[in-house]
């Protein structure tokens, strides 16, 4: 018989390598076949609900790392809640209308103008559904659990019907109106945009400083005076209707040397502009307050038959420019507001494609707006009005879909009034909890400062605005017509709007005083896609009986403060008077390792599919837990490799414990807590702390803290201590000994707790572990989270072992120094002499543990501190340590150096402890003998 055969060496079929890219797919197929998600939902029937409402990603293209970050985080939460006492169904959704799909069809060669609207819409629908299928497979491959066979889609008839009813709630409160005012206009999309559809990029614009000739100075300014105006959009000068100044600013009338003309500009900006214009010996003729310049008239620089009025506004700054702002009410929100105040015309001579119209003048007609800048500058120069041209770098709005710059343009649009219910919206946020906390202020400020919502779009692929027009042009959107349209959409889908004439979309026998002849027409615009997704609280939460409205949680990227969080809040307050969510959690963007936005053009993208193919979805999931998602997250293959190392640590730790509990039956072999060895009670209590901390972090969505705690628990508590000292008990002591069963009890409890706690994060791996445990549930996902125990005297126990760990740290330091001095090789070769004070001696006695075994040395003697020799190393005033080489020979079984090796003649290579264990448990070895 060989010595090795007498050891309890761990054995398990749980593999060291997970082969995740292959095994994950197999495991997901098993879940699908066994309907594990559905089983979990059935188990949770009757429990309190927790509803995480999915913000719908756009159905176009493969998912990117931002999608993975978001969906996996949601999966953490839903899985945890489902295992922790809540009914937590997850309904994924998709945003399926909008311009990008139209553009994809255009790129594929389809010409919208050569087919009917319904033919084009059908192509859009098919494309959207293809993209949904594509992304659904990719999300499922990440291991995300949910109702993948019953998602919500904004193109489904029941959703469109609910959306129309949301519109009806606005209309009922008289919050829908038709107006002509500047909106974000995308010439590349030929449509108005909402603020949430705009992104900003740094650009260089042509900046012009020019004079506008005073023709009526109201007794304040002479006729030979020029107002110095600044603009970064010279192409808008044909639509200029005035000059805006600030009533409280000081303005100066100056005359530079060699100039016959006088100029007006802000006093505070005189010096920098004089230098800019090359003015010398500037004489200040007069200083006046802005209020004194109100209503002064100037000549339009391109049309002397038009007059420009000087107005007082609150948006003029002294940060740059001249303190006088060129104002075109048809081309800007501030301009529009002050133009309305002064009753100016709203003039925007530019068409849908960005080309100036004949109203802009002969020189500009048919010219693309950006090209018109040069014409405007040339005209200013020819008229002697241009004082300075210079490039100006600033942030400028772009269409987030086409990535092309946009313009402000006054066009007739439908608006939802935000201003009329702003206070109600802001008040509704009082009861909403935000993660991070600053999110509340961010959303509050956005709602406080935003304008009314332009909800009309001049496109085809979307939900039509359910508005009819009477014979005299009166817009009809009463409760009767809107509910009827909603019913039609619910039955036939929104295609019915394009298939039928207006009269066939109205209720039978419908009459309206504004159409005495019974003739009606219908609106051709569709709704903003943010109205689509923003209505999901009605189209999904209120529509499905097993969901709740308001939802417990909305979780999306931080860009959704101006997107989905924003639009959903507005629509919910309009419908119900309250927020659609109880909590809002926002995440940062995924960037490359240099902090740049990922894009195909930069070649810096890392797709989830690439990482999954190489390392597995578990690594992507663990990576999500390992990063601080409250701010922007940098992504690199190196970061995934680092996480893969942590995953390997988790897997190997589990494998070691599985191997050492293979012969453990929790029903037959479990040792009660009060009968556990002291060190095992300590680890059981430490595990209990870990469970409590981890569950608390789950409850507060602190996944990074969970990851950190896991790595610390695996490394510090288990690998560096407990699993290290365990080998002397697990391998050496008799298989059924109390000491071994005591430790196996803790091993098993650690395994079960780790498996349950990390099923939300690493479901593929924990389900691989689960069959090795003797638990009643078929799948880990069907188990409940471990309960936090209330052990007696746990505080005292933890205090004692914390003190022991401090002593152990000093011992490890002394052993390291002894190794460096070549006194010993391995720690097991050491003989320790510990010199302790009376209090430490009493503490060690009370600890009731084998101190030598806990310190992993072959021999240990305790002495009074007063007996410490001079060459002992002191640690504070309670401990001194002397390290020497243990006397005796190495036992072939426990590898300790013992003086009693060979004391049993039958086992000459074993120490007395090992000989006794072998003699009792392997009696045949007495006659056959042992071989090394």
UniProtKB/Swiss-Prot annotation:
Location of motif 'HIGH' region in this chain is: 57-67
Keyword Kinase present in the record's keywords: the answer is no
Keywords carried by this UniProt record = Aminoacyl-tRNA synthetase, ATP-binding, Cytoplasm, Ligase, Metal-binding, Nucleotide-binding, Protein biosynthesis, Zinc
Question: Recorded GO terms, molecular function?
Answer: aminoacyl-tRNA deacylase activity; ATP binding; isoleucine-tRNA ligase activity; tRNA binding; zinc ion binding
Keyword Metal-binding among record annotations: yes
Biological process, per Gene Ontology? isoleucyl-tRNA aminoacylation
One Pfam family it belongs to: tRNA-synt_1
Q: How is the cofactor bound?
A: Binds 1 zinc ion per subunit.
Q: Where in the cell is it found?
A: Cytoplasm
CDD domains listed in its UniProt record? Anticodon_Ia_Ile_BEm (cd07960), IleRS_core (cd00818)
Report which reactions are catalysed by this protein: tRNA(Ile) + L-isoleucine + ATP = L-isoleucyl-tRNA(Ile) + AMP + diphosphate
Annotated InterPro entries: aa-tRNA-synth_I_CS (IPR001412), aa-tRNA-synth_Ia (IPR002300), Anticodon_Ile_BEm (IPR033708), Ile-tRNA-ligase (IPR002301), Ile-tRNA-ligase_type1 (IPR023585), Ile-tRNA_ligase (IPR050081), M/V/L/I-tRNA-synth_anticd-bd (IPR013155), Rossmann-like_a/b/a_fold (IPR014729)
Motif 'KMSKS' region, residue numbers:
597-601
Q: What is its EC number?
A: 6.1.1.5
Highest taxon of source: Bacteria
User: Where ATP is bound, by residue?
Assistant: 600
- Please give an example of a GO cellular component term from this record: cytosol
Report the cofactors: Zn(2+)
Q: Which NCBIfam families match?
A: ileS
Self-association or partners: how does it assemble? Monomer.
Annotated domain remarks: IleRS has two distinct active sites: one for aminoacylation and one for editing. The misactivated valine is translocated from the active site to the editing site, which sterically excludes the correctly activated isoleucine. The single editing site contains two valyl binding pockets, one specific for each substrate (Val-AMP or Val-tRNA(Ile)).
UniProt family annotation:
Belongs to the class-I aminoacyl-tRNA synthetase family. IleS type 1 subfamily.
Described function: Catalyzes the attachment of isoleucine to tRNA(Ile). As IleRS can inadvertently accommodate and process structurally similar amino acids such as valine, to avoid such errors it has two additional distinct tRNA(Ile)-dependent editing activities. One activity is designated as 'pretransfer' editing and involves the hydrolysis of activated Val-AMP. The other activity is designated 'posttransfer' editing and involves deacylation of mischarged Val-tRNA(Ile).
Question: What name does this protein carry?
Answer: Isoleucine--tRNA ligase
Q: Which organism is it from?
A: Lactiplantibacillus plantarum (strain ATCC BAA-793 / NCIMB 8826 / WCFS1)
């Amino acid at each position: 018989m060989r010595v090795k055969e007498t050891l309890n060496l761990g054995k398990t079929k749980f593999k060291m390598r997970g082969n995740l890219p292959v095994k994950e797919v197999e495991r997901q197929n098993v879940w699908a076949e066994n309907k594990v998600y559905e089983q979990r939902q059935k188990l949770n029937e009757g429990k309190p609900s927790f509803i995480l409402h999915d913000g719908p990603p756009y159905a176009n293209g493969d998912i990117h790392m931002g999608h993975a970050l978001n969906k996996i985080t949601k999966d953490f939460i839903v899985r945890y809640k489902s295992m922790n006492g809540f009914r937590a169904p997850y309904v994924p959704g998709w945003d399926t209308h909008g311009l990008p799909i139209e553009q994809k069809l255009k790129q594929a060669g389809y010409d919208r103008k050569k087919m009917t609207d319904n033919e084009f819409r059908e192509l859009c629908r098919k494309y959207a559904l293809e993209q949904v299928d594509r992304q659904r497979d990719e999300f499922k491959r990440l291991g995300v659990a949910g109702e993948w066979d019953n998602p919500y889609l904004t193109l489904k008839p029941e959703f469109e019907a609910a959306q129309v009813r949301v519109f009806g709630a606005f209309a009922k409160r008289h919050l829908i109106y038709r107006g002509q005012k500047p909106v974000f206009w995308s010439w590349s999309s030929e449509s108005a945009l909402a603020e949430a559809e705009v992104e900003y990029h740094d650009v260089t614009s042509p900046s012009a400083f020019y004079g506008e000739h005073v023709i009526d100075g109201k007794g304040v300014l002479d006729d030979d005076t020029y107002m110095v105006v600044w603009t970064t959009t010279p192409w808008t000068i044909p639509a200029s209707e005035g000059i805006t100044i600030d009533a409280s600013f000081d303005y100066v009338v100056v005359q530079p040397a060699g100039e016959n003309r006088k100029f007006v500009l802000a006093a505070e900006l005189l010096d920098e502009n004089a230098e800019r214009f090359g003015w010398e010996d500037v004489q200040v003729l007069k200083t006046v307050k802005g209020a004194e310049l109100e209503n002064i008239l100037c000549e339009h620089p391109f049309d002397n038959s038009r007059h420009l009025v000087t107005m007082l506004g609150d948006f003029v700054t002294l940060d740059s420019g001249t303190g006088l702002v060129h104002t075109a009410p048809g081309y800007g929100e501030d301009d529009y507001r002050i133009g309305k105040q002064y009753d100016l015309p709203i003039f925007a001579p530019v068409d849908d494609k960005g080309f100036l119209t004949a109203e802009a003048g002969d020189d500009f007609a048919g010219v693309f707006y950006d090209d018109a800048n040069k014409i405007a500058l040339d005209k200013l120069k020819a008229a002697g009005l241009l004082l300075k041209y210079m490039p100006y770098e600033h942030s400028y709005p772009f269409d987030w879909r086409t990535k092309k710059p946009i313009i402000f343009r006054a066009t007739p649009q439908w608006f939802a009034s935000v201003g009329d219910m702003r206070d109600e919206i802001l008040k509704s946020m009082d009861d909403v909890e935000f993660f991070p906390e600053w999110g509340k202020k961010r959303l509050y400020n956005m709602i406080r400062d935003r304008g009314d919502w332009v909800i009309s779009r001049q496109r085809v692929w979307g939900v039509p605005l359910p508005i009819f027009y009477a014979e005299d042009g009166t817009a009809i959107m009463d409760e009767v017509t809107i509910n009827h349209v909603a019913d039609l959409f619910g039955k036939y889908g929104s295609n019915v709007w394009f298939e039928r004439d207006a009269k066939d979309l109205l209720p039978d026998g419908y009459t309206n005083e504004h159409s005495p002849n019974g003739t009606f027409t219908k609106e051709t615009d569709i709704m903003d896609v943010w109205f689509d997704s923003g209505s999901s609280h009605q189209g999904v939460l209120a529509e499905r009986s097993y969901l709740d409205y308001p939802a417990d949680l909305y979780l999306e990227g931080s860009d959704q403060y101006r997107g989905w969080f924003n639009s959903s809040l507005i629509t919910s307050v309009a419908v119900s008077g309250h927020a659609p969510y109880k909590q809002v959690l926002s995440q940062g963007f995924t960037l490359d390792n240099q902090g740049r936005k990922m894009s195909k053009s930069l070649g810096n993208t890392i797709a989830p599919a690439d990482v999954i193919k190489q390392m597995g979805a578990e690594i992507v999931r663990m990576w999500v837990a390992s990063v601080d998602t409250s701010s922007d997250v940098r992504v690199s293959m190196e970061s995934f490799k680092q996480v893969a190392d942590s995953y390997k640590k988790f897997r190997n730790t589990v494998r070691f414990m599985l191997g050492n509990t293979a012969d453990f039956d929790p029903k037959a072999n479990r040792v009660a807590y009060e009968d556990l060895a002291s060190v095992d009670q300590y680890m059981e209590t430490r595990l209990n702390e870990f469970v409590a901390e981890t569950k608390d972090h789950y409850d507060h969505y602190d996944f990074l803290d969970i990851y950190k705690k896991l790595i610390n628990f695996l490394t510090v508590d288990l690998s560096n201590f407990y699993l290290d000292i365990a080998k002397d008990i697990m391998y050496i002591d008799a298989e059924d000994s109390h000491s071994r069963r005591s430790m196996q009890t803790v091993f098993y409890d650690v395994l079960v707790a780790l498996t349950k706690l990390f099923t939300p994060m690493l479901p593929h791996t924990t389900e691989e572990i689960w069959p090795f445990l003797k638990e009643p549930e078929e799948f880990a996902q069907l188990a409940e989270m471990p309960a936090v125990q209330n052990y007696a005297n746990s505080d005292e126990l933890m205090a004692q072992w914390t003190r022991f760990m401090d002593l152990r740290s000093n011992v490890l330091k002394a052993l390291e120094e002894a190794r460096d001095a070549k006194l010993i090789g391995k720690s097991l070769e050491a003989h320790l002499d510990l010199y302790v004070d009376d209090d430490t001696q009493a503490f060690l006695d009370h600890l009731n543990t084998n101190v030598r075994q806990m310190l992993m040395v072959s021999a240990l003697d305790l002495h009074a501190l007063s007996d410490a020799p001079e060459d002992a190393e002191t640690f504070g005033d309670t401990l001194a340590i002397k390290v020497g080489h243990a006397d005796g020979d190495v036992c072939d079984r426990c590898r300790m150096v013992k003086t009693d090796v060979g004391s049993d003649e039958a086992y000459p290579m074993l120490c007395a402890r090992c000989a006794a264990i072998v003699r009792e448990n392997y009696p045949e070895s007495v006659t056959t003998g042992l071989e090394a």
